[in-house]
């Protein structure tokens, strides 16, 4: 039987769940270009053991952009991943255009409106941005 403390000490402190924050400022979404994947996406990552999905999603956003969010992101959607975990997507609408300081996981960033999304972009993120029920401020 595997104990929680053994998982933590072996470096396995992530769950199968993950989450991210879609930050929207003046009808534009903050997106980052993945260093390994070469795909535009939102700042996201694994949720650690003991974290709530919102906590993990905000932590990942801050780690990957060096931006401290002022506001509480709202859960916009979630889906089951192939590994059995759940991905949680949060949205935060703000009026401040932050300049992220990227970490090793990203090579570029930008704010993009619905009609100017970069390519290649994660299919699910693109769908979420284009879905007026989830991100109405991005609708032209």
For each predicted feature, which ranges?
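Unchanged
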Residues: 45-135, 139-140
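Proteolytic processing junctions in secreted/extracellular precursors
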Residues: 4-11
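N-terminal strand-loop-strand
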Residues: 11-42
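A generic structural signal for ordered secondary structure
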Residues: 6, 20-22, 28-31, 74-75, ...
């Amino acid at each position: 039987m595997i104990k929680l403390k053994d998982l933590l000490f072996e470096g396995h402190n992530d769950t199968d769940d993950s989450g991210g924050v879609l930050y929207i400022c003046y009808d534009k979404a903050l997106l980052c270009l993945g260093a390994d994947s070469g795909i535009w996406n939102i700042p996201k990552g694994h949720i650690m053991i003991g974290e709530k999905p919102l906590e993990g999603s905000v932590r990942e956003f801050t780690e990957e952009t060096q931006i401290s969010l002022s506001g509480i992101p709202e859960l916009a959607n979630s889906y089951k991943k192939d590994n059995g975990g759940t991905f949680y997507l949060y949205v935060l609408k703000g009026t401040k255009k932050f300049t992220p300081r990227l970490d090793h996981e990203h090579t570029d960033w930008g704010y993009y409106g619905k009609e100017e999304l970069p390519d290649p972009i994660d299919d699910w993120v693109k769908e979420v941005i284009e879905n007026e029920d989830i991100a109405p401020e991005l609708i032209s």
